[in-house]
Amino acid sequence: GAVAQTTPTWFYYDTLALRYLGVGRFNQMYPLASILRHGGKVTLGSDYPVSWIGKDALNPMFNIEMAVTRQQAGNPEVPVQARVSERLSVDQAIRAHTSDAAWQLRLEDQIGTLEVGKLADIVVLDRDPYVSDPYSIHTIKVDYTFSDGRLVYRRP
């Protein structure tokens, strides 16, 4: 099946794109929810170092928030990147960073989900993104990171 690999850092209301593409094509940009509804897969990455948000692009929580809101992280006042119906759920955005990304790399038997026999690459967050205000997801911090089951990072 088809895989759309993109970065949510592009999902902000872009007046230049609207002007150059026109309303019809502008409203067709980034149809991620439609791709998922039709059986495709979506994977998300950072686009670092060329992304407009700089080093924040390296933080998946920024990308997850922008995939969920289709707005600049932490900025609910800016217009929504058309179409609101193309927003991803928190679960879809997390899967796009984990299990679906592993599938795209053909490594789903080794990484991407927590299962016996797979590498234990785990982050422990300070808050649950599933119940957090969507506009605060970018502020969620990583408390611990485990790589292949070993603690490699502990937030000071």
Describe the residue ranges of each PLM region.
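His/Asp/Glu-enriched, well-ordered alpha-helical/loop segment
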Residues: A2-V131, Y135, I140-D148
